[in-house]
């Protein structure tokens, strides 16, 4: 089916979303145009408002409508703990655990093949944040990928000479998981990170 230039532009715009391919973008575009024009208008208004009104917190670099986000303004948080994550969605995931420390959001992970070095992901800003704070421990909560591990290792090496504890989030067996369904790499990490049972 051949689409008009405006429909083609809408389809191409929808394809920038993660996990949205050509067919899904076509279905979304046609749904909005044929069956839910008011929903499409609301989507356009909400997207425009978010693009105009949401920026990055100047302290933690998470997404915020204000210069400093609500998490950074919360005086009840533990100023001795800094959790370093790869992106804003990771902040929300860690918050669900009840973590009460502070955050710093990198812009991804180190990936030399993609041209992402320390400056590109914000490591100089991280070091400034650490030096400006009163942190005793930096929790490296980057993803358990090759790049995430390399990023955590790189940061830990820098922090080694600063008298700070650099810790890494544990990873391994998911709660409720079955051994036979877990891949070998995950199981190897779980075995290497085993700990005694406290009674």
Curated annotation (Swiss-Prot):
Gene that produces this protein: recR
Pfam family name, one: RecR_ZnF
Entry superkingdom: Bacteria
InterPro entries: DNA_Rcmb_RecR (IPR000093), Rcmb_RecR (IPR023627), Rcmb_RecR_Znf (IPR015967), TOPRIM_dom (IPR006171), TOPRIM_RecR (IPR034137)
Species this protein is from: Ectopseudomonas mendocina (strain ymp)
Toprim domain span: 80-174
CDD domains: TOPRIM_recR
Full protein name: Recombination protein RecR
Function according to Swiss-Prot or TrEMBL: May play a role in DNA repair. It seems to be involved in an RecBC-independent recombinational process of DNA repair. It may act with RecF and RecO.
Zinc finger (C4-type): 57-72
HAMAP family: RecR (MF_00017)
Keyword DNA repair attached: yes
């Amino acid at each position: 089916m051949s689409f008009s230039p405006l429909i083609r532009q809408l389809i191409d715009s929808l394809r920038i979303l993660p996990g949205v391919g050509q067919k899904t973008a076509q279905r979304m575009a046609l749904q909005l145009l044929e069956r839910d024009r008011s929903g499409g208008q609301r989507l356009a208004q909400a997207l425009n408002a978010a693009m105009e009104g949401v920026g990055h917190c100047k302290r933690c670099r998470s997404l915020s409508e204000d210069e400093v986000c609500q998490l950074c303004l919360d005086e009840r948080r533990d100023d001795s703990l800094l959790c370093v994550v790869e992106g804003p969605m990771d902040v929300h995931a860690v918050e669900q655990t009840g973590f009460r420390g502070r955050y710093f959001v990198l812009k991804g992970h180190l990936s030399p093949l993609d041209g992402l070095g320390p400056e590109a992901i914000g490591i100089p800003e991280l070091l400034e944040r650490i030096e400006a704070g009163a942190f005793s421990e930096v929790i490296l909560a980057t993803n358990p990928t090759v790049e995430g591990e390399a990023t955590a290792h790189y940061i830990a090496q820098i922090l080694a000479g600063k008298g700070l504890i650099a810790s890494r989030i544990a990873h391994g067996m998911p709660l409720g998981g079955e051994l036979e369904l877990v891949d070998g790499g995950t199981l190897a990490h779980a075995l290497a990170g085993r700990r005694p049972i406290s009674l």
